[in-house]
């Protein structure tokens, strides 16, 4: 917002489950949210999606940049103490990612009942673009690092985090 001259704003932290209801109640004017919340608001006729890819465009300064907004994570102590089990877990997870990539419509059926996404919107919600640890390109890691650096620059993190060191290596 600052990059677009909107300095007179009051950002507030709001639980994601309150984004759409808060707009509907007139308590807030706009919200930056993640999926499926944007689609839920749109389908219910409460909100309109103004723009997608805002992190890439405004924080990473490249509208085509990948943004990794979530992770599948494994505790470091487990990786050290039970590496064989972790490899099995990662292989099973990769198999699931491959299934979603190859069968997106079939995968959508699992959204209802296994997530908070209601059956009425499973066909509307964009599916995640999964990127496995061994698929990251150097440019992906550079954009990932740039995103984390924002938190260091804003004094949210007390020291710089090295993103590359946080990625599982197999």
Model-predicted regions and their roles:
Residues 18-111:
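Pocket-lining segment of extracytoplasmic ligand-binding domains
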């Amino acid at each position: 917002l600052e990059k677009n001259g909107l300095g007179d704003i009051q950002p507030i932290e709001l639980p994601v489950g309150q984004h759409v209801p808060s707009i509907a109640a007139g308590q807030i004017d706009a919200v930056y949210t993640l999926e499926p919340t944007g689609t839920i608001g749109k389908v219910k006729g409460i909100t309109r999606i103004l723009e997608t890819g805002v992190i890439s465009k405004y924080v990473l300064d490249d509208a085509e940049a990948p943004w990794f907004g979530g992770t599948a994570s494994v505790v470091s102590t487990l990786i050290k103490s039970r590496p064989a089990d972790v490899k099995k877990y990662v292989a099973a997870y990769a198999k699931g990612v491959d299934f979603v990539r190859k069968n997106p419509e079939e995968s959508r059926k699992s959204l209802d009942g296994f997530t908070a996404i209601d059956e009425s919107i499973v066909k509307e919600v964009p599916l995640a673009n999964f990127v496995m640890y061994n698929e990251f390109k150097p440019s992906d890691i550079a954009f990932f690092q740039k995103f984390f650096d924002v938190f260091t620059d804003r004094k949210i993190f007390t020291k710089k985090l090295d993103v590359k060191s946080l990625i599982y290596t197999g």
